[in-house]
From Swiss-Prot:
GO terms for biological process: translation. The keyword Ribosomal protein applies. It comes from Streptomyces avermitilis (strain ATCC 31267 / DSM 46492 / JCM 5070 / NBRC 14893 / NCIMB 12804 / NRRL 8165 / MA-4680). The keyword Ribonucleoprotein applies. Forms part of the ribosomal stalk which helps the ribosome interact with GTP-bound translation factors. Is thus essential for accurate translation. Keywords: Ribonucleoprotein, Ribosomal protein. Belongs to the bacterial ribosomal protein bL12 family. This is Large ribosomal subunit protein bL12. Homodimer. Part of the ribosomal stalk of the 50S ribosomal subunit. Forms a multimeric L10(L12)X complex, where L10 forms an elongated spine to which 2 to 4 L12 dimers bind in a sequential fashion. Binds GTP-bound translation factors.
């Protein structure tokens, strides 16, 4: 009669298996017990409440230049200060609006950049 293995002993046995052997074991386990090893994904609630919660949890923001306004030269200067772009690249970015100026930055950095751009006369979105 086989002895019952503890969780620790089972884990030690799994550690000794190669990756291929472990994958074969998982497949056999799934077939034997009619289960899958895929992680369960929780369904997100729909509606405006979910959108508000997602906005609160967001930690990376994009600063989108939507228009240069009347003071295009000032906006180009601010874009150059915020990014490491050269004069031509910054001008192309401003001329090609709407375009992202900064991507995946912290909320504080995004707000500060948006204020700088708005101060220069640009219209900006933070997403």
């Amino acid at each position: 009669m086989a002895t019952k293995l503890s969780q620790e002993e089972l884990l030690e046995q799994f550690e000794s298996l190669t990756l291929i052997e472990l994958a074969e074991f998982v497949k056999a386990f799934e077939e034997k017990f009619d289960v899958t090893a895929a992680a369960a994904v929780a369904a997100a609630p729909a509606g405006p409440v979910a959108a508000a919660e997602a906005a609160e949890e967001q930690d990376e923001f994009d600063v989108i230049l939507t228009g240069a306004g009347d003071k295009k030269i000032q906006v180009i200067k601010v874009v150059r200060e915020l990014t490491s772009l050269g004069l031509k690249e910054a001008k192309d970015l401003v001329d090609g609006a709407p375009k992202p100026v900064l991507e995946k930055v912290a909320k504080e950095a995004a707000e500060k950049a948006a204020e700088s751009l708005k101060g220069a006369g640009a219209s900006v979105e933070v997403k």
